[in-house]
Regions:
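Long, low-complexity intrinsically disordered regions
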Residues: 104-107, 118, 193-196, 299, ...
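Generic alpha-helical segment signature
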Residues: 51, 207, 321-324, 456
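Trp/Phe/Arg-rich N-terminal binding region typifying the photolyase-homology
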Residues: 1-166, 270, 333, 379, ...
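Active-site-proximal binding-pocket segments
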Residues: 120, 234-422
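Intrinsically disordered, low-complexity boundary segments flanking structured domains
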Residues: 20-23, 55-59, 110, 131-136, ...
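Short charge-dense sequence patches
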Residues: 1-14, 30-38, 63, 200-209, ...
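Glycine/tryptophan-enriched, flexible segments
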Residues: 141-298, 410-411, 415-477
Length: 477
């Protein structure tokens, strides 16, 4: 038997522009292996549910290209299982799409150690970024810490390589290897009552859905600069969960967007603004690679001494979307039901927790990690630190979002709040009712009620006082 090419599948569930997949195919008949391991199960429940959808759809796509051979799904630790399999099949190199988090790098190190006695190696392929970390440097030769010059440098340089086409046909490995039945797989048993809501309201998954969504967005990109901050409108690309699991690559997005801007100049300004948001994602990953502790430690280390409040009751009310602040609660309920939250609303929700309630940003990040289908460790850590004021290129400490003013400006008719809040100002819609049906039974799920109006001003006043006192007693500048 010809030795196969093995793809260790952890991310990048796509055929197009998938360097790891193409490299494995070049080695020999394709064997794609996915492991249900400790790292997979450590992800948030909604993220695991979304990963399972990506896995099923990619398996079906591979079966079409291979004549019926899909993904071999195994339960256990990859570094304990793959070396013996590679030895039996006479395979000397293993291919994986890189995902440079601390946890994944530790797993990759264990895999390298397990393969070393066999004379085999692990080859990592860039699949989730436009440019390789370190390819763009600031004037002093170091990594960029501010977004604007980073974005200019990446735009001037362009992606590392063109987006590759999907392989037209794939020769599969025919060695019988068993594996779990994907049709009965359940990676998120802890979703409980929330599963039905995600299945009903979450966006379509899969590579084809991602490409269709991108093309649909580019058709209306001219309105993006004007409407992107409006949660009551369908004005964004909704590609974040596709990017999170790798159903579409940023290189594909970049190439299609640039081509559309050239063909349709009337959309060029909107596409340019959209690509600036793609570059924010890129920036966050370059920051994470340079500062791997970003999801758990303040970028500005002096902020570790900030006196965050240990207010368990307020945190629980925030997690349960019962703060009494309409825009905040609407956003948290949108996240619970759909696995996503509009970006403008995310900033308001995060500001309420970290500024009005003075609760540690890491508590908010943990809740988002459990509830988001588009969970991205780099983007979410950077954005939480940006709002809290402790991150690179962060918002100034006195930047405290006023939820009522934000709602007046960006949800002027109340359509967004009305959609998610039963009792906001009229009969509940299907989404608001679904919130009651999908949350744990011991939560308070009566009609939504606004909190006292004075709490906005009082919270802002207390936050400014605490932040000013902190700055006066630290080296924060």
């Amino acid at each position: 038997m010809t030795a196969p090419g093995i793809l260790w599948l952890t991310r990048d569930f796509r055929l197009r522009d998938n360097p790891a997949l193409l490299a494995a195919i070049a080695d020999g008949p394709l064997l794609t292996v996915f492991f249900i391991d400790r790292l997979t199960m450590a992800q948030g429940a909604a993220s695991r549910w979304r990963l399972e959808r990506a896995l099923r759809i990619f398996d079906a796509a591979l079966r079409v290209r291979t004549g019926g051979k899909g993904i071999v799904v195994l339960r256990g630790e990859a570094h304990e299982i793959l070396p013996a399999l590679m030895k039996r099949l006479s395979v000397r190199q293993l291919h994986q799409s890189d995902w440079p988090t601390v946890e994944m790098q530790a797993l990759q190190d264990r895999m390298r150690a397990a393969l070393r006695p066999l004379g085999a190696g692990l080859i990592l392929h860039p699949g989730h970024l436009l440019v390789h970390p370190g390819a763009v440097r600031s004037g002093n030769g170091g990594a960029y810490r501010v977004y604007s010059p980073f974005a200019r440098a990446v735009r001037q340089r362009g992606p590392d390589r063109p987006a590759a086409d999907a392989p037209p046909g794939i020769e599969p490995c025919t060695e019988p290897l068993g594996g779990l039945d994907l049709s009965t797989l359940d990676l998120a048993p802890d979703l409980h009552r929330g599963r039905a809501a995600l299945e009903r309201f979450a966006a379509p998954a899969g590579e084809e859905a991602a490409l269709a969504g991108l093309d649909d967005f580019l058709d209306r990109a001219c309105a993006y600069p004007r409407e992107r901050d409006r949660p009551d409108l369908d004005a964004t690309s909704r590609l974040s969960d596709h990017l999170a699991v790798g159903e579409i690559s940023p290189r594909t997005i970049w190439a299609r967007a640039m081509l559309r801007a050239e063909i349709s100049p009337e959309h060029a300004a909107g596409i340019d603004k959209f690509l600036s948001e793609v570059l924010w994602r890129e920036f966050s990953w370059h920051l994470l690679i340079g500062f791997p502790e970003m999801p758990v430690a303040c970028w500005r280390s002096e902020w570790e001494g900030f006196p965050w409040q240990k207010d368990g009751a307020s945190l629980i009310r925030w997690q349960r979307a019962e703060t009494g602040v309409a825009l905040v609660d609407a956003g948290l309920r949108e996240m619970w039901l759909t696995g996503q939250m509009h970006n403008r609303v995310r900033m308001v929700v995060a500001s309420w927790l970290t500024k009005h309630l003075l609760i540690d940003w890491r508590a908010g990040l943990a809740h988002f990690a459990d509830c988001l289908t588009d969970w991205d460790p780099a983007s979410n850590a950077m954005n939480w630190q940006w709002v809290a004021g402790c991150g690179p290129d962060a918002a100034p400490y006195f930047r405290i979002f006023n939820p009522e003013r934000q709602a007046e400006q960006y949800d002027p008719r109340g359509d967004y709040r009305r959609r998610w809040l039963a009792g906001f100002d009229r009969a509940a819609g299907p989404e608001a009712v679904a919130w009651i049906e999908s949350t744990p039974r011991d939560w308070h799920t009566g009609p939504w009620r606004a909190g006292p109006s004075a709490m906005l001003a009082e919270g802002r006043k207390a936050a400014l006082a605490a932040l000013a006192h902190f700055r006066a007693n630290t080296s924060e500048t």
